Amino acid sequence: MNQPTTRRDFRFSSRLRVRWAEVDMQKIVFNAHYLMYFDTAIADYWRAMAIPYEETMHQWGGDLYVKKASVEYFASARYEDQLDVMLKCVKVGNSSVVFHGAIFRADQLLVTCELVYVYANPATQTSQPVPVEFRELLTAFEAGEPMTSVKTGDVHTLGADAFALREEVFVNEQGFALEIEQDAYDATSVHAVAYNRLAQPVATGRLLPSKELQTPSDPIKSSKIGRMAVHRVMRGSKLGRDIMNTLMAAAKSRGDAEIVLHAQCSAINFYAKQGFTERGLPFDEEGVLHIEMFKLL
C-alpha cells in the first residue's frame, strides 16, 4: 500500500510546536516523541470527525488497541519548530483499522508512520468486527464529507437534546444550579443543535425573541443569543462558530439589526472572533464574571 507523502494526500492535520522537553542532547526531537505526536494527533482525528471518542466506543461495546506502529525518519525537527501531523485512514478490515501518517515542517517531509489498530472487546481484549457505523464514518470523513449538521427548531423539536447537553456543560461541568439552567425563555426561543453523523448532539445555543430598541435615529430590532454549550471534548473544533453563524442568520432573516449576549469572561476571545464587541463593564451572573457583547447585523 502506497504511503501518502504530500500534504495534499491528507484531509486531516494537527499542528503543534516542539517543546524544550522533547529535544535530546543532539538538540533535535528525541526519536520516540514522533510516535507520541502521531498518537496525540489521533485524538484530534476523532474530534475532526465530531466523535466523543470514549462515550461512543462505550456505546459500541469496543475500543481500538495498537497492534503495530512503525516510523520512518527523513529529517529532524528542532526546538520551536511548528509541525503539522497528518493522518489518513487507508484501510478498514474486518477487525482492523490502518492509518498512515506524516509529519511536515512547512512542505518538508520529516517522518512517516503506519499505525495498525485492532477493534476489540475491552473486557477480554479479543478482536471483534468493526461496527458498520464506525466503518461508514471513516469512509465519509476521508471522502471529504461534512461530519456535522446544524438543526434549528423550537423547544418541542430540539429541547430534549439541547437540555441534555446544556445540563452536562452548565450543571455538571461548570456547577450552575439545575433549577436555573432551564427557564421561561426556552419556550419562545429558536434553538440550534449541532449533530454528528451518529445523531449525537455536540453543540447548542438559543436565540431569544426580538426586542425593539430606540436609537438616536430610528428604532431597531435587537435579540439575544445565550446558552451556548459545546461538548467538552469537541471544543476548539469550530462547532461553537457553526451554532453562532446559524443563530445570527436566523436573527438577520427576521429583521434583527443587533445581536447581544452575556459572555463569560473566559470566552471573550471566542466571541470577539465572531465579530462581537465588548460593551460596559464585567458583572457577576450566578457567581461567574460576564460581560455584555454586541454585534450589528
What would you call each of these model-derived segments?
Residues 230, 236-249:
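Conserved acetyl-CoA-binding loop-helix of GNAT-fold acetyltransferases
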Residues 38, 146-179, 186-191, 195-200:
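Short amphipathic alpha-helix that is part of the acyltransferase structural core
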Residues 284-297:
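C-terminal "cap" of GNAT-fold acetyltransferases
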Residues 114, 193, 200-215, 222-229:
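Conserved beta-strand in the GNAT
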Residues 118-121, 228-235:
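A short, internal acetyl-CoA/4′-phosphopantetheine-binding micro-motif in the GNAT/acyltransferase core
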Residues 1-84, 90-150, 192:
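Terminal targeting signals and extreme-terminal segments of soluble enzymes
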Residues 260-269, 284-287:
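Conserved beta-strand-loop-alpha-helix junction that forms the acyl-donor binding cleft
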Residues 244, 251-264:
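Conserved GNAT acetyl-CoA-binding A-motif
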